[in-house]
Design a protein with these regions (language model features):
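Conserved lysine of the Walker
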Residues: 18
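Hydrophobic positions on the alpha1 helix immediately C-terminal to the Walker A/P-loop
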Residues: 21
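Conserved nucleotide-sensing/catalytic segment adjacent to the nucleotide-binding pocket
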Residues: 51-91, 95-96, 100-109
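The conserved Walker
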Residues: 14
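Phosphate-binding P-loop
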Residues: 1-7
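A glycine- and Lys/Arg-enriched "phosphate-lid" helix/loop adjacent to the NTP-binding pocket
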Residues: 102, 106-168, 177-184
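Conserved substrate/cofactor phosphate-moiety recognition/catalytic segment
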Residues: 26-68
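Hydrophobic anchor at the beta1->P-loop junction of P-loop NTPases
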Residues: 10
Length: 199
């Protein structure tokens, strides 16, 4: 019996709640009997490994992130058993497209050539994209930074808009607005995800 594989990106600007949402979504679908795999956020891994934007420069830094993202996505797909008795959902904490928003057009082309990829082909890696709105947009009083995220609100807003512009051309793109109660935001995300998966 062939079981369904659904590949979903959860993206969004700084302080959108992506990582927390992914943990909640993972648990929700595991409880429904799905096999749920997660491709963790790559920039955080790169930064914690010691490769920083300040020391390595923008292009080597972004190229390292994109290259690792590509490898992680391949590994997860290759690890899937050929015979599995349940449907599979792969959750991506941001996708390849996200990592191109930090460089200009010439730099994008150079990275594509160096890694032998095409951005427009990368959209096909994912079945659906759920964009969680950054609290910087609409709820700036709830915005905060972390060890690996240090953008001011203004920069976070700029990134939010770039992410939206980059992803909204995907064949299934859904924008999840911020809510005062984060539970409402999570519930809205899961509701829309259910509609997509069960369609």
């Amino acid at each position: 019996m062939t079981h369904k594989l659904t590949k979903i990106v959860i993206t969004g600007g700084p302080c959108a709640g992506k990582t927390t949402a992914i943990e909640r979504v993972k648990l929700y679908y595991q409880n429904l009997g799905y096999c749920v795999l997660v491709v963790a956020e790559t920039p955080t891994e790169i930064i914690k490994s010691g490769i920083t934007l300040e020391e390595f420069g923008k292009i080597p830094f972004q190229k390292a992130i994109i290259n690792l993202q590509i490898q992680k996505e391949k590994i997860v797909l290759e690890a899937l058993p050929t015979k599995l008795n349940k449907d599979v959902i792969i959750l991506y904490d941001r996708g390849i497209i996200d990592h191109f928003i930090y460089v200009n057009q010439t730099e994008k082309t150079n990275i594509e050539e160096a890694l032998n990829i095409r951005r427009d082909e990368c959209y096909k890696n994912y079945d659906a994209v759920f964009h969680m709105c950054s609290t910087a947009k609409g709820l700036p009083n709830l915005f905060f930074n972390t060890e690996c995220r240090k953008e001011p609100v203004e920069e976070a807003l700029k990134l939010e808009n770039l992410i939206k512009k980059a992803w909204e051309i995907h064949s299934f793109y859904y924008f999840v607005e911020s809510e005062l109660d984060f539970e409402d935001k999570i519930n809205k995300l899961i509701k829309k995800m259910n509609e997509y998966i069960k369609n």
